[in-house]
């Protein structure tokens, strides 16, 4: 059985489509979901099992940029470890800055990356991940 990881940003526009996708895939695949603290308020914890990951927003506070860049690189290594530990075959990103470390980690590990953009405009994270995505 394929192991699929759905990574989603913290807004309702990212999380709600992710939960629908989770529901659709859960009967045929082993599916996990990852979001950040902002996204947790949109996820029904009784219905969905998910992991919380803290990824800094690089552009929110410019004076924290050096620290946040360091944390971002740590997140990439944590994402690699997460994908290996969970034997993930496919990563599906619905966008949001917290999804990029997982997309990059999947690319490094030669896993398939699928992008699902629920918004009318392609976001920055999915735009960068487009370079190494499968679809």
Feature names for model-found ranges:
Residues 30-32, 38, 109-135:
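Active-site-proximal region of nucleotide-activated glycan assembly enzymes
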Residues 4-9, 28-71:
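Conserved nucleotide-sugar phosphate-binding/catalytic loop shared by glycosyltransferases and other
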Residues 52-57, 94, 116-119:
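Short beta->alpha connector loops at strand-helix junctions that form conserved
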Residues 29, 47, 88, 133-134:
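Short, well-ordered alpha-helix to beta-strand connector turns
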Residues 14-25, 38:
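Short amphipathic alpha-helix
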